[in-house]
Amino acid sequence: MDVILLEDVKTLGKKGQIVKINDGYARNYVLPKKLGIEATAKNLNDLKLARKREEKEAAEELAAAKELAAKIKECTVTVSMKTGEGGRTFGTVSTKEVAEEAKKQLGLDIDKKKMKLDVPIKALGNYIIQIKLHKDVTAELTVKVVEK
């Protein structure tokens, strides 16, 4: 019996795959547990339409991420920190603070978990932060640390 998998099944395959399995295994395990559905003409057509929809949504997400990356590249976020001698800050500038300042100053809602600091920001100056917006799109945000 041909079955379209609705979920990843370790022994059979990944979600959306069409696999040939024994009738008994399909009727007694895969179908009752909603791990897959029978591969009828209607279900195959539904699968094809769902794949097209997913591809279209993925393309839209990628385009939106590229647009946001272009917007972010042009922007600079300014963070004010208390400093001691030699321009050293009291504490470090975290991704949380950068995300909050980006929201305040630029209106950009960026998740702090998507930001990557190469080195801790402990001094005044300009820094580049990598932001992973999409699996294929990474943006660079310029952060300027100034004295409070």
Curated annotation (Swiss-Prot):
InterPro entries hit by this protein: Ribosomal_bL9, Ribosomal_bL9/RNase_H1_N, Ribosomal_bL9_bac/chp, Ribosomal_bL9_C, Ribosomal_bL9_C_sf, Ribosomal_bL9_N, Ribosomal_bL9_N_sf
Disulphide-bonded residues: none
Pfam families: Ribosomal_L9_C, Ribosomal_L9_N
SUPFAM superfamilies tied to this protein: L9 N-domain-like (SSF55658), Ribosomal protein L9 C-domain (SSF55653)
A biological-process GO annotation: translation
Keyword RNA-binding included in the entry's annotation: yes
Assigned keywords, A-Z: Ribonucleoprotein, Ribosomal protein, RNA-binding, rRNA-binding
Any one annotated GO CC term: ribosome
Family, per entry: Belongs to the bacterial ribosomal protein bL9 family.
Cited NCBIfam families: L9
Annotated protein name in UniProt: Large ribosomal subunit protein bL9
